[in-house]
């Protein structure tokens, strides 16, 4: 993710996304840059209008938000069941201290 963030930072600063620029941003952030990843990122972004891609991506989550919310309800039930098991196990563990 750091590599993508570096490219986004360069784009927002109106700088060209080059291997050297991405490496400089990563090093400034205290991250050791992997040359292969940097080259792959720059190659993947070649010819891509980042601002346009962000605008298109910003629209997509809005349409998908409703199904995700509907799917979240069953996940909450599972979490509650796990909490009950954890509580029972913790109570059993505490009971063992007094035996």
UniProtKB/Swiss-Prot annotation:
By its UniProt entry, which InterPro entries does this protein fall under?
Answer: P1/P2_N_sf (IPR038716), Ribosomal_P1/P2 (IPR027534), Ribosomal_P1_arc (IPR022295)
One GO BP annotation of this record = translational elongation
Top-level taxon of the source organism? Archaea
Q: How does it assemble?
A: Part of the 50S ribosomal subunit. Homodimer, it forms part of the ribosomal stalk which helps the ribosome interact with GTP-bound translation factors. Forms both a pentameric uL10/P0(P1)2(P1)2 and heptameric uL10/P0(P1)2(P1)2(P1)2 complex, where uL10/P0 forms an elongated spine to which the P1 dimers bind in a sequential fashion. The proportion of heptameric complexes increases during cell growth.
Give the function comment from the record.
Answer: Forms part of the ribosomal stalk, playing a central role in the interaction of the ribosome with GTP-bound translation factors.
- What family is it from? Belongs to the eukaryotic ribosomal protein P1/P2 family.
Q: Can you name this protein?
A: Large ribosomal subunit protein P1
